[in-house]
Amino acid sequence: MHVHNAVLYHAFSGRHALDLRPGTVYWCTADPGWVTGTSYGIIAPLVNRVTMIVDEAEFDLDRWYGMIGREKVEVWYSAPTAIRMMMRAGVEAAAPYDFATLRFMASVGEPLNPEAVVWSEKVFGQPFHDNWWQTETGGIMIANRPGMAVKPGSMGQPMPGIVAGIVERDGDSVSELGTGKVGDLALRPGWPSMMRAYLHEEARYRKAFVDGWYISGDLALRDEEGYFWFVGRADDLIKTSGHLIGPFEVESALIEHPAVAEAGVIGIPDDTAGEIVKAYVTLNPGHDPSEALERDIRGHARKKLGPAVAPREIVFRNTLPKTRSGKIMRRLLKARELGLPEGDTSTLESDET
C-alpha cells in the first residue's frame, strides 16, 4: 500500500534519476499495470510536465527504432528484456535509424547485464543507465544518474536523501558490512514513496523492518567508490562446493557468448557439491541447438567464471518464462526441474517453450 504523498518522490526522482524536465519528449515502455508504468510512465512525467509517448502495441523492433527518431524522443526508460531483444537483432538492425535526439536512456525491472551496457554505447552512442527499486520502495532508490560515470553491471549509487547499506542480519539486530562484502541490500526508512503496508499481511510487513532498516530481500555488494552491485535474490542463491553463487553473475557471462540471447540459471541438488548450476538459454538467430554448441558455451563459461561456478548443464529453449515486467522466473524453472508446486503464476506473461 502506498499513499498520495508518494508523488513528491516521483517528481524528485523523475527529475534527478531520469532527467525529466518541462517539455522533455519521454518514452517509458512499461505497461501501466506494472509499478514502473504507473510511477514513471504516468505520475513522474505528469508532475514534471513532460511530453509522453504512449505505445500500446507489442514489441516491434522497427517500430520502436523508428518511433525514437520520428517522435524525437529525448529520454527513454525501458527494461533489460527489451534491450536483449534489440541486441539479438544485431547492431546492423539499428543502422538505418536516427537516434540523435536521445540524451538519456535508463533501464529497470531486473539487473542490466554489462554486455547490454557496452552494446548500447555502440548502437546509441551512450549507455543505458541501470537503476534499482522495488514495488515496496515506490520509487527509484539507487541509480546511475545523469552525469555519473557508468560502471557496466552496477546499478549505481543511492539517490540524494536515500541511505542504503549492505548489512548482515542476526536475529533482531543488523550490522553493516564493509566494501566488497556480499550481504542484504537495506535502506533506512523515511522517504515519501515508501510502502505503508502489505494489504492484510501485517506480520509480513513488520518482518521487512529490522533494527531501523528495511531489508529488501536482494543481495548486493558496495565497491570502494560507493557503487552498488546486484548479486541475486536471497532465495535464488546457489551453494555449490563451498561457493555462494548469484545467478546474475552466471547469466551475464553466458550472454557474452555470441550464440546466447538470454539465460536463466538455477541450482539443482547434487550429492557431492550440494548444488550444481544448471542454465536454460535461448539462442540468437543463426544458431541452432547442438551438443557441440552446448560444449562451446560451457567452455566459454568456465573460462569466464572458473569450473566451480560455470554451469554443469545447459538446456536450450525457444523462450523462457517471464513476468509482465520481463523478469525471468527462475523459481518456475526450478519448480519444474524438481517437480515441485509452481506456486502463484498470476504474473506469468510468457511461458517457456
Regions found by a protein language model. Name each.
Residues 69, 76, 191, 196-197, ...:
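AMP-binding/adenylate-forming catalytic core of the ANL superfamily
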Residues 61-65, 94, 206, 251-252:
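Short hydrophobic/charged patches on amphipathic alpha-helices used for structural packing
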Residues 109, 133, 156, 218, ...:
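Active-site glycine-centered loops adjacent to acidic/histidine catalytic or metal-binding residues
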Residues 157-161, 172-207, 245, 340-341:
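Conserved ATP/PPi-binding loop(s) of AMP-dependent carboxylate-activating enzymes
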Residues 101, 161, 259-262, 307, ...:
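Glycine-centered tight turns that cap/initiate beta-strands
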Residues 5-28, 32-75, 88-89:
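Conserved AMP-binding/adenylation subdomain of ANL enzymes
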